[in-house]
């Protein structure tokens, strides 16, 4: 597919075909599955989404971050086609395969740090975090999880507890998972004037030591840059101080 890389509106929004599809959707799709935009996508190329009415939109979300190299990127299309022709799917925990091992090798070889590295792959970020917490609790024998103000981690029961905002994802869904504590995040625009990243990290560490106790902490989960929380970039030195 080769779409002109610009916004083009051919009908009102939503167009008649999208409205028809939306009526069909309301009859069969759970109301719990929301949609931000009232348009139904028919195709995509590069940074452009095309709906069923022929309107073209610039995808500023990059498919929610997972297609930063563009829609229908030819290298990706070729790789998917090659793999689908080779075999479609088998469960790695039943009958493993080489591409999984190769992907783990690629990931771990590019990770920083002088320590043994291993990887596991999951479908979503929330699923990955559920497993992170399970692994950390098993490995440490501890149960407490530390997260940070303004964080967003997912929509499972555990990750909704790890989110900073209760609304909209956690509204009316209690009780959520326990043993999760939110610590103050470095937020240069809101922190006291002149607070450094190191000072913000020590603030969080001191809070967790008092609130949780280092001997109870299984893991600390943090977004290096917070997206849904407000595009918050911590002050320089915050992450490295936490890491130490």
Residue spans of the language-model regions?
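Glycine-rich loop-to-alpha-helix module at the N-terminal edge of alpha/beta enzyme cores
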Residues: 2, 6-10, 56-142
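Gly-rich Lys/Arg/Thr-decorated short loops/hinges at beta-loop-alpha junctions or inter-strand turns
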Residues: 30, 84-88, 179-193, 224-226
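Active-site-adjacent loop/helix segments that line or gate small-molecule/cofactor pockets in enzymes
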Residues: 2-45, 95, 100, 200
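PLP-dependent aspartate aminotransferase-fold enzymes
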Residues: 105-219, 237
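Short acidic, glycine-rich surface-loop motifs adjacent to enzyme active sites
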Residues: 214-231
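Short, small-residue-enriched loops and turns at beta-alpha junctions
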Residues: 66-68, 96, 189-190, 227-229
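Catalytic PLP-binding core of fold-type I/II PLP enzymes
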Residues: 214, 232-244
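Active-site and channel-lining beta-strand-loop segments
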Residues: 38-60
């Amino acid at each position: 597919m080769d779409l002109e890389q610009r916004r083009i509106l051919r009908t009102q929004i939503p167009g008649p075909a999208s409205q028809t599809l939306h009526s069909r959707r309301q009859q069969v799709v759970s109301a719990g599955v929301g949609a931000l935009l009232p348009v139904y996508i028919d195709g995509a190329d590069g940074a452009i989404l095309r709906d069923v009415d022929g309107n073209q939109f610039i995808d500023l979300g990059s498919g929610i971050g997972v297609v930063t190299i563009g829609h229908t990127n030819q290298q990706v299309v070729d790789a998917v086609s090659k793999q689908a022709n080779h075999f479609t799917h088998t469960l790695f925990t039943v009958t493993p395969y080489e591409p999984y091992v190769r992907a783990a090798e690629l990931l771990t070889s590019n990770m920083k740090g002088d320590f043994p590295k291993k990887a596991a792959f999951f479908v979503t970020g929330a699923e990955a975090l559920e497993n992170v917490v399970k692994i950390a609790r098993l490995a440490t024998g501890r149960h407490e999880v530390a997260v940070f103000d303004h964080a967003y981690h997912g929509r499972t029961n555990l990750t909704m507890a790890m989110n900073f905002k209760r609304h909209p994802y956690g509204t009316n869904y209690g009780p959520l998972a326990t043993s999760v504590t939110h610590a103050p995040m470095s937020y240069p625009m809101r922190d006291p004037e002149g607070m450094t990243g190191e000072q913000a990290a020590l603030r969080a560490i001191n809070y967790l030591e008092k609130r949780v106790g280092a001997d109870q902490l299984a893991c600390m989960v943090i977004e290096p840059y917070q997206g849904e929380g407000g595009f918050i970039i911590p002050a320089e030195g915050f992450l490295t101080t936490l890491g130490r």
